[in-house]
Amino acid sequence: MSTLYQVNKIKEILIRFLETIIINGMNSFSSTVYGQNAERSNTPTLIDPSNKETANVCPISKNLFQSYPKGSYRNSQRLTSRNGLDRFIPMTSNKDTISLGRHSSLSRNLVNKTKNASETYQQLLEYALEVERDDNVFTYAKLQKSDMTQKCPTMVASEKDNKGKLNEKKNRSPENLLPFRILDAPELRDDFYTSLLSWSPKGDLAIGLAENIYLWSKELGPTRVLEESIYDVSSVAYSYNGDILAVGRVDGTLQFWQDNERVPRISIHHPGDIGVLAWKPVLETNRLLVGKGNGNIFVYDIIWSESTSKAVLVATITNAHDEQVCGLTWNHDGSQFASGGNDNRVCLFKGSDLRQPLYVWQQNAAVKALSFCPWQRSLLATGAGSHDKHIRFYNCFNGKKIDELYCGAQITSIHWSPKYREFSVTFGYSLETVQHRFAVYSWPQLECLVSVLPSVPDIRCVHSVLTSQLNETTGRCEMTDSIIIASSNETIKFFDLSEESSWHNSRVLTWHGIFDSQILEMLEGIDGKIDSHLR
């Protein structure tokens, strides 16, 4: 017999078999063929359409998937007899083919589980490869894809669980904070180009009021007034460990004070006022940056001991700014520092190379607010004045701008949180639509978490500083949970940013390096030796 005859014979058998199913109905077919008392043959059964006794017999026996030894009866029948053509076994898993399996509850459960498992596998495969089954190979127009994260079955439960929390967070209004302490500060200068607050890790707050320096501590309150002068104070700064207080005045006088002493140990005079001071945050050296009104930056090493006190001029930077320097800050380990000026310019320097800036970024207003991120070494935030009103974020390793945030107000200070992925900002002059004077934003979402309105209209926050404490074991300075803000209404307010607050963004993980990963630290340019430790 030819192969064509065999194919036609199979087709004829299938057609008659399907006709039988349709005529007798599926119920009759199931009860006759699959009933519990149905007779099951132990040998293959040939369907003869002309034989009424075999016309309604299912051509599948219970031994269909039973294995036979080589050379057994089944193999011989299949090879030597046409009885091997008595059954058609579909070798496909196509969902459109007719299933002839036993439709018991167990079979249905197995089919459903298999189908669900297959569907889950397909969804996981789509998610992993970022493709969709609906995509057409010959569709050349770019179709808008749905969110692939919604297709991953393993994410469905967690997404449903977090959906309420996410929506609540997105729809939640910023929190309002109340100060836990308020100090009067008569004659506090309302001047964007000065820096009149400094906190010592020993617990003292230095405040420049007109020509005087006041010291305040939690235990003693206002303690004493340092030497009076006829020239107003324009900048104050405590050294890293709090041993030295540097004071700059509008006439260019630079003084260095020791605790419990009534006269300065060192006094230097420069022409032009001193708007900002910044100590290098390390124990090994007392290096100080001095920002001048003419745009120059002086770099001093201060030798400070019981027997000797002197200031050594290390360098004078003249190629950074053309106008007054109003912002200076170091990164956490003293390897870089940044300066901002009234010439709308931000300059980034290597601490080991003072000859020229590493990068220069142009803004649209004077830049006073500068802050390096303590847990991401490559990140620098800059805040510009009333003609710009933007916070910009830069990568300190390649000089590229990462992001920016329009605040609608003059930015007077920025402080990164040492514990959470967020930063606080104080504002000066603002638009009518922007009323807050102090805010906390999440990073990198840039969502406003805290918004503090002014107690009286038309005031601005001019100066601010984060509190810190000295670790007696390591001798190092650690940031704490408060921010101190001086406003143009001659008040100084203390705000609590402690861990008990519910509005915080995600927490910075505990680390011994910057990222708890040598690979990431290598990418960030970190050699594993740092001079500070964040909790």
Curated annotation (Swiss-Prot):
WD repeats lie at residues 189-226, 228-267, 269-314, 320-359, 362-404, 462-505. Gene3D superfamilies: YVTN repeat-like/Quinoprotein amine dehydrogenase (2.130.10.10). SMART domains: WD40. One of its GO terms (biological process) is positive regulation of anaphase-promoting complex-dependent catabolic process. Keywords: Repeat, WD repeat. PROSITE patterns: WD_REPEATS_2, WD_REPEATS_REGION. The keyword Repeat applies. Pfam families: WD40_CDC20-Fz (PF24807). InterPro entries: Cdc20/Fizzy, WD40/YVTN_repeat-like_dom_sf, WD40_CDC20-Fz, WD40_repeat_dom_sf, WD40_rpt. GO terms for molecular function: anaphase-promoting complex binding; ubiquitin ligase activator activity. SUPFAM superfamilies: WD40 repeat-like. Belongs to the WD repeat CDC20/Fizzy family. This is Uncharacterized WD repeat-containing protein C13G6.08. It comes from Schizosaccharomyces pombe (strain 972 / ATCC 24843).
